[in-house]
Amino acid sequence: MKKIAILANHSGGLYDFRKDLISELKKHANVTVAVPHNDRWEELQKLVDEVIELPVDRRGMNPIHDSKLFRQYRAMLKEVKPDLVLTYTIKPNIYGGLACRMAHIPYAVNITGLGSAIENGGWLKKFVLALYKPALQGARGVFFENAGNRDTLAATGVVPKGRDVVLSGAGVNLEDYPYQPYSQEGPVR
């Protein structure tokens, strides 16, 4: 059976927003996820074949921490030997993507949002785009959750032509999170 690895920066977010996709993938492949140990850990363990705890400093910009994450991704890929890797969120997309590219493992990147580093501009935007470019160039596909993010990144030249896909329906499962009218009174909860 094929092996798929999924890299993300939050176990709860991966479970809450990707469990339907993971369940479908499980019908066709063994699924390993590498995520930090936080929300929904036990549920994620029941859903997949293997969960590897891999800390991700989601908001930090420490190059020592990020280089450690890159090395951990390299080691994990060498151990798991996946046939395909899916990455979610900026650090797994960049460092996981680069690790996959160096290991010649096919991978697809899901850009869930641009984040403040790109949206705020300046030197940090240039730095992040410089990291994104080689990470995305090796990807088999670059998935976006909205056309605006795709257009913004495509305009910078970091997205490989013909490999970008805007997903329709990458949002929440309305059976798990039913529609509720917006409250006009009091704080939003």
Feature locations, PLM:
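Alpha-helix capping/helix-boundary segments
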Residues: D39-R40, K91-P92, G148-R150
